Design a protein with these regions (language model features):
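Extracellular glycan-recognition surfaces and repeat-rich motifs
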Residues: 1-40
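Short beta-strands within extracellular/lumenal beta-sheet-rich domains
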Residues: 44-63, 119-121
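Extracellular carbohydrate recognition
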Residues: 45-52, 142-160
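Extended, low-complexity, turn-rich repeat/linker tracts enriched in Gly/Pro/Ser/Thr and Asp/Glu
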Residues: 60-64, 73-82, 144-147
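Extracellular beta-strand ligand-recognition surfaces/modules
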Residues: 70, 119-149
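Extracellular carbohydrate recognition and processing domains
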Residues: 97-130
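Surface-exposed binding patches on compact interaction domains or structured appendages
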Residues: 165-169, 173-175, 195-208
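Short, solvent-exposed loop/turn segments enriched in Ser/Thr/Gly
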Residues: 181-189
């Protein structure tokens, strides 16, 4: 795909294009695929691998919205697996050094129960201190061989969509001291919304 970069940062294997066959519920869907499984690697000859699939340049300064979305599916996942898939923010403002950092607060499918299921992610970058032009990368780390079968698929990557419902609270956490027989007030909370079909409702739980 034009503008995408496919990097084998450690080892020689990278991502590749894949189309699901007739036996899969996603038959005919074209995706990016990655796995470290290799049946030809003999026991004891396993090697670490790291592959990065990088988006085209994304215009943070001028984009209609700051929403980054994608779908991911993991197959042959195992509880406590060491294979990892991360979404990374990439800044290339310094031509001599590429800055790469995993996006915090985001967990990719990595358990047996999540295997075979598509998951959709909406990452709202509004208010983040990012470069005017940036990149996103899907980084996979594993060990190439017969013991690491985890396989991931990426599809429907978008940036700048304006049709997604969004709620943005001014506060994500509230903390204050409450004393007996004395009123206590939290900081004021405002909520801005986009593309909602229903009114916003507030529910409080616990001993308030």
């Amino acid at each position: 795909i034009d503008g995408w970069k496919n990097l084998a940062q450690e080892g020689t294997r990278a991502w590749w294009g894949y189309e699901f066959g007739d036996t899969d519920e996603s038959v005919g869907e074209k995706v990016a695929k990655v796995t470290a499984y290799d049946s030809k690697v003999a026991d004891g000859d396993e090697t670490p691998v790291e592959m990065m699939l990088v988006t085209p340049a994304l215009d943070f300064k001028n984009s209609a919205s700051k929403m980054f979305t994608f779908r991911v599916r993991g197959d042959y996942l195992m509880d406590n697996q060491t294979d990892t898939l991360q979404l990374c923010y990439i800044d290339m403002e310094d031509p001599d050094e590429m800055y790469v950092a995993p996006v915090g607060g985001l967990t990719m499918p990595c358990t047996k129960d999540e295997s075979g299921e598509w998951n959709e992610y909406h990452i709202d970058l509004t208010g983040q201190d990012l470069a005017d032009v940036f990149f996103m990368g899907f980084r996979f780390k594993s060990i190439r061989g017969r013991e690491h079968a985890a396989t991931y698929y990426i599809d429907d990557v978008t940036y700048g969509r304006t049709d997604i419902p969004v709620m943005r609270p001014s506060e994500t956490q509230l903390a204050f001291v409450a004393l007996v027989n004395k009123d206590a007030e939290s900081a004021a909370v405002t909520v801005t919304t986009e593309n909602l079909a229903e009114p916003v409702k507030l529910t409080l739980g616990g001993a308030n």
